[in-house]
């Protein structure tokens, strides 16, 4: 499966905070690293401190941990 920037994907990595959520592919690295796909989400995770809306809204995944929901418009 070849993912491209802008594709909507569902997360299949069970230990991920975003398991089952849908995110947008921000970039796909071609250099051969283990987790080449950066996915951006609408909400942040649990990182941050009390009273703050800060946190992380991106994560790296392998292509086999992602399911294509909607291809990006061309």
Curated annotation (Swiss-Prot):
SUPFAM superfamilies: Electron transport accessory proteins (SSF50090). It comes from the Bacteria. GO terms for cellular component: photosystem I reaction center; plasma membrane-derived thylakoid membrane. It is found in: Cellular thylakoid membrane. It is a peripheral membrane protein. The keyword Lipoprotein does not apply. Keywords: Membrane, Photosynthesis, Photosystem I, Thylakoid. One of its GO terms (biological process) is photosynthesis. Belongs to the PsaE family. NCBIfam families: PRK02749.1. Stabilizes the interaction between PsaC and the PSI core, assists the docking of the ferredoxin to PSI and interacts with ferredoxin-NADP oxidoreductase. This is Photosystem I reaction center subunit IV. The lineage of its organism: Bacteria, Bacillati, Cyanobacteriota, Cyanophyceae, Synechococcales.
